[in-house]
Amino acid sequence: MNIEIYKLAEELDSFNYQQVQDEILAILEKGCSVVLDMTVCHYISSTGLRVLLYSKKVAASKGQELYLVGITDEVNDIMNVTGFNSFFDIFSTMEECQKAIDH
């Protein structure tokens, strides 16, 4: 499986969602699954959540994956409250993610 790591900025919101979505979709178009490094992202808006969900759906339609790694407490709270955490494979570390991918 071809995989690329994409590192999110400190926020994913209405100001940067289009760029993030375009970059994730470009990775998927290359035939790669995406590991989304969220270790510095401390805020995600509803627009940002839609980007994640849309990217996950596109990945699935292509037989690829979207993995979330290193979610901060702030973003984890938002994802738990909205129920979005149930839609994604979420890992604490890159090592955990790599082990899951390898199996």
Model-predicted segments: where are they?
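Short beta-strand/loop segment at the start of cytosolic alpha/beta domains
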Residues: 1-7, 19
